[in-house]
Amino acid sequence: KVNLKNGPKVSNVMYGTFFGGDTAMKEFRNGFDGVFSTYIGYNGSHQVFNGNSLWQNGGTLGVTGTLYKGDWFGGWTIATGLSGVDANTMYGSENFGMWSIGTALKTGYNWELLNNKFIIQPHFIASYSLVDTFNYTNAAGLKIHSDPLSAVQLAPGLKFIGNLKDGWQPYLGVDFMWNIMDKTKFTAMDTSLPQLSVKPYIQYGIGVQKRWSERSTGYAQAMFRNIGRNGVIFSLGYRAAFGRGK
């Protein structure tokens, strides 16, 4: 659940899948290596609050560049998305569209201990998102207009990773998610509605990664959220390398 400032508690269920591809690792100057990636995904969600129900379905397209030097890494991604919303309210059914664009930077360091059997990874993510809803007329006949939602999120975190035999890597992680610029203005028939925003929250959980070879890895994890929002995220992933690239 998401506890909105100046608003209701929202029950939020999200789901989706992503597919992407990476280039071969490229060598740059001063000891840097890098890889470029593209990805496309489907995302859906269902929100319920105060007797209202919203279903969202859409897609995302993005690109990422990642640099490595020794135990340090840093990545930059940019993505855009388009979604359709089917809403059911006390006045009837409504349909409208949303679009978004966003970018994020992530950097971290792998501190290797006990002959690389244990890794402590401090990391930091900074992201910016711009989300806008197309103007529409709701089921009550009111014209709804909203300013674009402009959100910045800062997320420092810490990850503890174990290197076991046969390519197994169990890990624990914790992140603090802080939203510092996340208010938008809604108007209905030129009347301003209350501003809503998301409270900071903590995300923590466990996972495991399995490396079958240099070209094949998979993972499964469960992340829990508390304080500003409550819930759990389950995710699975698999990566395979093809061709002759490194």
Stretches with model-predicted labels:
Residues R29-D33, I125-S127, Y201-I206:
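Short, functional N-terminal and low-complexity linear motifs
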Residues K1-I119, Q221-G228, I233, G237:
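Outer membrane beta-barrel translocator domains of Type V secretion systems
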Residues L4, T23, N116-K117, T133, ...:
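Short linear motifs in intrinsically disordered/low-complexity regions
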Residues N6-N12, N50-N57, G84-G97, L130-V152, ...:
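Solvent-exposed, glycine/polar-rich loop segments of beta-barrel outer-membrane systems
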Residues I120, I125-T133:
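Solvent-exposed flexible segments
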Residues G62, T66, K143-K246:
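Outer membrane beta-barrel transmembrane domains
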Residues Y42, T80, A126-Y128, V174-W178:
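Short, small-residue-rich loop/turn micro-motifs
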